[in-house]
């Protein structure tokens, strides 16, 4: 797994992840800036078979990466309307889940957008499994909790039904680590239990079921 970023930061400063496998590489949440240095670096790491993103806020540069490597662009059917820049060839659309490469599966969770997704990497965390979550599941600074965001700029939460849908979508998968959309923080261990526990805590706050002085 390789991280790819831009300095100084572009847009909201997200960090891309390159998942490398014996049958090709997946670029997840591509950064909003692409130049020859980045192309050479990714080519040296094996190039790209496919490009995708956790949600439409990170769709902007997918077409550029696709054209640079003649790679597939993968887009949830629910969010296809947000893909406004034409990729090298018609995008591959999917719903529910999509096995992209051996051990790498895209999982539609909903929440932030209808097609918001995570990538499950079975070989991550030393074989214990990892999620690449963008902000579908948002790792908090203490690296011991996660949260869920409806609109980050407007500071709006997700409703209970959406939180439960996100957790239910990832529940069948084995994972011990979560890489969010930025260099830090990373939820390094016990991630599945943390997601379940954090979701219940989040829902308690939505319902007002917290102490007067929490």
Q: Where are these predicted regions, by residue range?
A:
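Zn-dependent metallo-beta-lactamase
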Residues: 1-22, 193, 211-214
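Short Pro/Gly-enriched beta-strand edge/turn motifs at strand-loop
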Residues: 1-7, 99-106
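Structural signal for conserved beta-strand scaffold positions within catalytic alpha/beta enzyme cores
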Residues: 3, 53, 75, 92-94, ...
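A structure-centric signal for secondary-structure junctions around beta-strands
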Residues: 13-15, 22, 88, 103, ...
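Residue-level detector of beta-strand structural context in well-folded domains
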Residues: 15-17, 96, 117
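Metallo-beta-lactamase
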Residues: 24-36, 49, 71, 81, ...
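Active-site HxH/HxHxD metal-binding segment of metal-dependent hydrolases
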Residues: 32-102, 197
